[in-house]
Curated annotation (Swiss-Prot):
The keyword Protein biosynthesis applies. Signal peptide: none annotated. Belongs to the class-I aminoacyl-tRNA synthetase family. TyrS type 2 subfamily. PROSITE patterns: AA_TRNA_LIGASE_I, S4. It comes from Burkholderia thailandensis (strain ATCC 700388 / DSM 13276 / CCUG 48851 / CIP 106301 / E264). It is found in: Cytoplasm. Its EC number is 6.1.1.1. Transmembrane segments: none annotated. Residues 351-411 form the S4 RNA-binding domain. SUPFAM superfamilies: Alpha-L RNA-binding motif, Nucleotidylyl transferase. This is Tyrosine--tRNA ligase. A motif ('KMSKS' region) lies at residues 243-247.
Length: 413
């Protein structure tokens, strides 16, 4: 089935196309419309013309974490099938601020923030994508030239009633929480990106489904063949509760040091581990099922967690780094102090323990420091600190918070 206005003929669905479709569907939440996408794949195979696969990311923060790589991994799989990947940096839409999943207006970024964040975005994404097979675009290329006249014409193509079909907008409207007019523009501008790029498929998280469908509708209005849409699940953070987010502190950045990345991955629950295998591992589903069977048969879950952590560390660093990270983790687990801990010099002795931990960079706040003390997670030279009112005298010592955070502190008066 095809929605192309020129009604192109159907192409045969071969075993090769079925395989490509199976690769595409691995781990996805939804592929709309599957029959249309199968025809796009078949046409591409018959004509030798690659599909145009679009992924837009707003540079709202300078770092990419593992949650972002769920959709990047899918892009790489499609790239390996021979299709053109368009890595779209939303430098224009970042000025608006994506309201998806928000219960309040998202503050737009400044041009300076956007440019600073965008500099490192693709360099990190290229750790997943094939740099040579990736087309990099900025949506300011076609959005800025629209001007007021073009923006008004674009806005006329969608109604407020349709916008209020979005769950987050509906909840805010019913709850009396303000919705700014500029927030309605975001889905329209993202949809217009698909028109400008003539996309065959657009990828996004499940929270992006409405925006992706707007792109499909706008393409129809502009006389283009409609894109299919593919949504990927949102990866849970290290806590296994909320989606991975830097602001929530439950993330693993792909630029983190190997030891830190490895340690964080080893901290996830045994249940969450299998979710990470499905969404982050490049192992086949059959192999993952076999490993899971071994776990259910009594093998220690730690063995599989080590496999996962090593695979991910090796992907973003090297196999040698992954091996060293495992050695470091085992050393710490036995109570040892890592060799590469930071050295910090502080003044003000005697210094309150909460302030010492914060100033040493081991915790973000004194309240977090006190919480760790309550839980027995703070040690000085191997001795557990239990007194939240402790004043630390001048000297040199190793301070530890939790299993992974260390600092060699020199405290002076």
């Amino acid at each position: 089935m095809s929605t192309d206005p020129t009604s192109k003929p159907a192409f045969p669905i071969t075993d090769e196309i079925r395989h490509a479709l199976a690769v595409t569907k691995r781990g996805v939440d939804e592929l709309l419309i599957e029959e249309e996408f199968a025809q796009k794949l078949a046409r591409s195979a018959a004509t030798g013309k690659p599909l145009r696969i679009k992924l837009g990311l707003d540079p709202t923060a300078p770092d990419i974490h593992l949650g972002h790589t769920v959709v990047l991994n899918k892009m790489r799989q499609l790239q390996d099938l021979g299709h053109t990947v368009i890595f779209l940096i939303g430098d224009f839409t970042s000025l608006i601020g994506d309201p998806s999943g928000r219960n309040a207006t998202r503050p737009p970024l400044t041009r300076e923030q956007i440019e600073s964040n965008a500099k490192t975005y693709f360099e990190q994404a290229a750790l997943v994508l094939d740099r040579e097979k990736t087309e990099i675009r900025y949506n300011s290329e076609w959005s800025m030239p629209l001007g007021a006249d073009g923006m008004i014409k674009l806005a006329s193509r969608y109604t407020v009633a349709r916008m209020l079909e979005r769950e987050d907008f509906t909840k805010r409207f019913q709850g009396g929480i303000p919705i700014s007019i500029h927030e309605f523009l975001y889905p329209l501008m993202q949809g217009y990106d698909s028109v400008a790029l003539n996309a065959d498929l657009e990828l996004g998280g499940t929270d992006q489904k409405f925006n992706l469908l707007v792109g499909r509708e706008l393409q129809k209005q502009y006389g283009q063949e409609q894109q299919c849409i593919l949504t990927m699940p949102l990866l849970e953070g290290l806590d296994g509760v909320e989606k991975m987010s830097k602001s929530k502190g439950n993330y693993v950045g792909i630029g983190e040091k190997p030891n830190d990345m490895f340690g964080k991955l080893m901290s996830i629950s045994d249940v969450l581990m299998w979710r990470y295998f499905e969404l982050l591992s490049f192992r086949s589903l059959d192999e993952i099922a076999r490993l899971r069977g071994e776990a259910e048969g009594g093998r220690n879950p730690r063995d599989f967690k080590v496999m996962l952590a090593q695979e991910i560390v090796a992907r973003f660093h090297s196999q040698a780094d992954a091996e060293r990270a495992l050695e470091d983790f085992n050393h710490r687990a036995k109570g040892g102090v890592p060799d590469d801990i930071p050295t910090v010099t502080l003044a003000g002795a005697p210094l309150a323990i909460g302030q010492l931990l914060k100033q040493a960079g081991l915790v973000p706040s004194t309240s977090e420091a006190l919480r760790n003390i309550e839980q027995g997670g703070v040690k000085i030279d191997g001795a557990t600190v239990s007194d939240k009112a402790l004043k630390v005298d001048a000297g040199e010592f190793v301070v530890q918070v939790g299993k992974r955070r260390f600092a060699r502190v020199t405290l002076t008066a």
